[in-house]
Amino acid sequence: MSYNTFGHIFRVTTWGESHGPALGATVDGCPPGVAIEAEAIQHWLDRRKPGQNRFTTQRQEPDAVRILSGTFEGRSTGTPIQLMIENTDQRSKDYGEIARSFRPGHADIAYHWKYGLRDYRGGGRSSARETAARVAAGGVARAALAALVPGLRIEGYMVQIGPHAIDRARFDADEIERNPFWCPDPDTAALWADYLDGLRKAHDSVGAIVEVRASGVPAGLGAPIYGKLDSDLAAAMMTINAVKGVEIGEGMAAACLTGSANADEIRMGPEGPEFLTNHAGGILGGISTGQDVVVRFAVKPTSSILTPRRSVTTDGREVEVVTKGRHDPCVGIRAVPVGEAMMACVLLDHLLLDRGQTGGLRGTIG
């Protein structure tokens, strides 16, 4: 199985399976001299780890990260950084009944068709457990961004679960860390809690939409045509488990706007040009404008549910499948820190690409 690596200069390779002894990431291309501590990476992993509330899987994993290489005296050396996270709470017996049947909505049947075999224990590489490695790599990227672009900030939050979207008029960034949904609207967070409780009792699950916003992004990241920043961001978010759609800025809603409404007008401010709106999501022509970079992605409902679903076995028999084990009623909740990590990795990668191509030179206006 190839294609376990992403990035151009800042390159991340993830490895390991959901029920294997460990998983992790090999990070190559981090500039030397960046302050990197396991405790700082652990902070980001703790936001993603399972079992923290009744709305996520009850699998109890500490997700304790170990840095095996690539640092010396707390700083990156420029060599590959190896990050490892041990699995400690696997229950492979929960998956014995699906060893020869395919779970509807899962990658099981696609993996079987392509490779002729699959790791049925939690889905192996297709499990969302793989995203812990991405969050660890994102911690390295955040550390490098903090050193290279002080003031750059990345924040993710939920904007919709099922049919229930936040009211943006009540958007309060301070609320994001105060509830289990990373929700900036406290009224909607309370509604989501009741809604998910009902779904759990009905042995069902639901999808969600996550928004990730990066502020303080310098203008000039990305390149025309095949090196677009938004192209790489969309690709990065689409690699996250269960993601089925990605939007940049206004996204699909831009199709409903007129040109006069969608085009972000510009005026001269005290420090140069200023945009009056941000329908473009901080990217024009594939290149960052200095505005907030805004990405949204849609996560499908968790496929592992206790409701019986029709399927087939490896020998062609029709069966009903009930997926036992511990699963998220809404996998979108824990996708928030993953989206943040992917944003960090892509922004750092493009920052390094830009420095290599232009040396940081910029055109001037005024």
Curated annotation (Swiss-Prot):
Write out the residues that bind NADP(+).
Answer: 48, 54
Does the record carry Membrane as a key word? no
- InterPro entries (UniProt xref): Chorismate_synth (IPR000453), Chorismate_synth_AroC_sf (IPR035904), Chorismate_synthase_CS (IPR020541)
Q: Which GO terms describe its molecular function?
A: chorismate synthase activity; FMN binding
GO terms, biological process: amino acid biosynthetic process; aromatic amino acid family biosynthetic process; chorismate biosynthetic process
Question: Which EC numbers characterise this protein's activity in its record?
Answer: 4.2.3.5
Q: Which residues of this UniProt protein bind FMN?
A: 125-127, 241-242, 285, 300-304, 326
Give the top-level enzyme category.
Answer: lyase
Textual note on the cofactor: Reduced FMN (FMNH(2)).
Give the record's pathway: Metabolic intermediate biosynthesis; chorismate biosynthesis; chorismate from D-erythrose 4-phosphate and phosphoenolpyruvate: step 7/7
* CDD domains found in the cross-reference section: Chorismate_synthase
Report the cofactors: FMNH2
Which cellular component, as a GO term, is one annotated location?
cytosol
Q: Which UniProt keywords apply?
A: Amino-acid biosynthesis, Aromatic amino acid biosynthesis, FAD, Flavoprotein, FMN, Lyase, NADP
Q: Which Pfam families match?
A: Chorismate_synt
Q: Which reaction does it catalyse?
A: 5-O-(1-carboxyvinyl)-3-phosphoshikimate = chorismate + phosphate
Known partners and oligomeric status: Homotetramer.
What role does it play?
This reaction introduces a second double bond into the aromatic ring system.
Family designation:
Belongs to the chorismate synthase family.
Q: What is this protein called?
A: Chorismate synthase
